[in-house]
Amino acid sequence: MERDKYIDEQIERHFQEFKKVYPERELFAICLQGSQNYGLDIYTDEYKSDVDTKAIVIPSLEEIVLNKKPISTTHILPNNEHLDIKDIRLYFENFKKQNINFLEILFTDFAYVNAKYKEEWDYLIANRELIAHYNVNQALRCMAGMSMEKKKAMCHPYPTLLDKIEKYGYDGKQLHHIIRMNNFIFAYGEGKTFEECLTYLPNKEDMMKAKLNQYSLEEALQLAEDFDNDTKSLKDKYLKPQDEINKDALEVLNKIQYNTIKKRLREEVI
């Protein structure tokens, strides 16, 4: 099956699953997350990339008035694909934290958007580079932090990774993320757009080799150490003396969040 068609069908499946499990929830958008967004997905007999998504939902009047805890959960589909569901208020806070796993949905080619909120979504996408540079220092720290987390996880026998750890001694998916973070922070620090950073893969073959656990354990550990250390050095090189908050990006986020929730509440009340 042609790749894009397959991904579109999986997004639709996630949407239908969302409606079935959370029929009372008002959806803003469901967006693709993961390897397909940066050109590192694989579809072979040996390895098949999951199609995982993030869903942004809009709170109800009751949730706001009664100050209920905003939803933030992960629903696992029967095929083990993940659907992360998060209140728009929490999701926009994650934009401000500059976590690239949350920012990447602004640049995906695969999303289901609730037609009622298309105007707000289009405005969000029109300002995606602004939002992705809300706090450059924080973005750099986040990239370095992700590299460190992946390095710690690379040989840890998590239940879902136990087979890989027992067979290879490490999880190649974590190693390929360490290399990816190194590419990303270099491109970001050198002034490339966030969109360019997502697909900046000068060593793509090495990353695929890592993802498929084709390095020996000794090689993998050395690569992880070298790339993680270089990422830390690049973070220190590009960090500015003080954090600078992009006020225009903040205004955009506040405006979209306000207008989106207002539209939902107006419809609910009237």
Which residues make up each language-model segment?
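N-terminal regions immediately upstream of nucleotidyltransferase
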Residues: 1-14, 207
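Conserved aromatic-histidine-acidic binding/catalytic patches
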Residues: 3, 45-46, 79-80, 166-173
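Conserved NTP-donor binding/palm subdomain of two-metal-ion nucleotidyltransferases/polymerases, i.e.
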Residues: 14, 19, 23-25, 29-32, ...
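Active-site nucleotide-donor binding segment shared across nucleotidyl transfer reactions
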Residues: 17-68
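Generic structural signal for hydrophobic core residues of well-folded globular domains
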Residues: 57, 95, 182-189, 264
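A basic- and aromatic-enriched beta-loop-alpha substructure that forms the phosphate/nucleotide-
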Residues: 64-156
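Conserved nucleotidyltransferase catalytic core and NTase-mimicking acidic/glycine-rich helix/loop elements
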Residues: 116-255
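A cross-kingdom marker for long, charged
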Residues: 251-270
